[in-house]
Amino acid sequence: MTDAFLSDAPRPEGGAPDAPASSTALPELHRLLPPWPGDQLPVSGGEVFVRRTPWTGPVDGDVDGAPRERALYVHGLGGASTNWTDLAGLLAVRLEGWAVDLPGFGRSQPPPRGRYSIRGHVRAVVDVLEHVRAQPGEGLGRPVHLLGNSLGGLVSLLVAAHRPDLVATLTLVSPAMPVYRVPPSFSRALLLLLLPGIPSLAEKRMAGITPEESVRAMVRMCFGDPARVPRERIDQAVAEMRERSEQPWADRALTRSMRGLITSYLRVGRANAWRMAASLSQPTLVIWGDRDKLVDPALAPRLAAVVPDSRLRLLEGIGHVAMLEAPEPTARAVLGMLEQLPGR
């Protein structure tokens, strides 16, 4: 994408500091982790599926006095809670984790009357955060570390701005921030989704795509180096896509959430996401792959410069889903931020 794509996004006046990388010992991912178990959770107007990753404590087993905090992971457009499997497993040395399937995605039911919107996703995440914070044990009643990717990054940013009492820190992995002056070819394809009837046509076209084709396209678009993706992860993704294809609302969830995302870009004034970013009070980590094909990496320093208490980590050779493609560097950046917080 050209710089014209970004010309109306805020320009940094000063660079954000580089995110430190933690030297904490992490479990070795000798094998691919299976998806963490989960359950349906009631939220406003329905239910969402939430997976839970138990806290493991330090690798050396010395749990006396070891920090034990809580985290919520929010996936991106077309993703699911399983996108966070490996990262949640690594961060379990410090964080007990919950990962949500946004309404209509993964194993979650669609929202009431099929009304997908950014605000609806924000409400669902707030409800899950309230649930996580209310769970008994260490961390009861405390703010939760919130991590989001792409659409989930934008949703997480808005949650942190609206409900700072719920969010301890914010980690944004290639968040889908508003961009303007889009190149004409890109603009026409997306803006058509705003027209009545077009999302339904897109849904019909998507219904003819096989799970294997969908996964191959996703890997090409989302990963900096598709060859890095283990065959087992491809097979797992295809199985998930087959499961999704049996849900009558699956294609609608994707197209209508994309429409809601584009609509949210049109908000001005205090409701604009860039204004919200400037109002954040939480320590914030911005992570971006320099081969991101979906959200231009040039946005990374701009976002980090706008957020008051931010740090930035750019990952060389990585695409749009750093938590999937580079879980260990991502985990070390998250832990590096947490270890720098006062009293940690």
Residue ranges with predicted function:
Residues 153-164, 170:
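Short glycine-enriched nucleophile-adjacent loop
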